[in-house]
UniProtKB/Swiss-Prot annotation:
SUPFAM superfamilies: DNase I-like. GO terms for molecular function: catalytic activity. It is found in: Cytoplasm. Belongs to the UPF0294 family. It comes from Photorhabdus laumondii subsp. laumondii (strain DSM 15139 / CIP 105565 / TT01). This is UPF0294 protein plu0699. GO terms for cellular component: cytoplasm.
Amino acid sequence: MVKKTYAIRYVAGQPVERVFPMSTHQLGNTLPVGTPLITGTNELRVVVWNIYKQQRPSWRKVLKELTNESQLILLQEAQTTPDLVEFATSNYLISDQVPAFLLPQHPSGVMTLATSHPVYCCPLREKEPLLRLSKSALITVYLLQDNRQLMVINVHAINFSFGVDVYSRQLNNIGVHVRLHNGPVIMAGDFNAWSKQRLNALKRFTRYLHLEEVSFTDDYRTIAFGRPLDFIFYRELNIANAIVIPTDASDHNPLVVNFY
């Protein structure tokens, strides 16, 4: 029996809801009208962090600091423990998580916390060919204050595979949505680009979709085999500043970018 892919939606005071993938046909047409991402300035602050299933005790303190004036939090390896769910619903209007796989108690996967409801939501999963576990991605679209629609892609890429066929397939499944979207895009997360082959596949993919890479002056991103694992790509936006924050609250350091 094929397992259905879905997102789990958390909203304060409401029952937990399963959200199934919306049709890509809606991207080529008119999406529902939404409420703009709340921002007191013209800048959009985005945080990207592999939170390591909250295995280190200081995760909540660091995450609380990161939420200050951030409209979007893109987490990877977010395990929906009561503590994380309480944090998400207390600090953000809505949180969507894609369970990559079910742990004994709480599912783990990518999770996007936002200050407004998405007008489009499509969870994706790809199975690790060697470990037979899944990695997840989440595509959401939000209204901006200038009435443009922002596509946000939260990615945790396949890690263990021979060659890059499955890795590229995961990216290409995301690309189907990006190609149909008219407007700005942010694609970010843990891309596990630890080999030359993987990095080249990622670069080809982002060039094809006209996505630019965010660079960091003081680059403290987590490294594996001499290459960074975490990236932020974008189009039709400008960067005000971009930083990496060193921390021992996870095995990855969070990335923070202000767009305008």
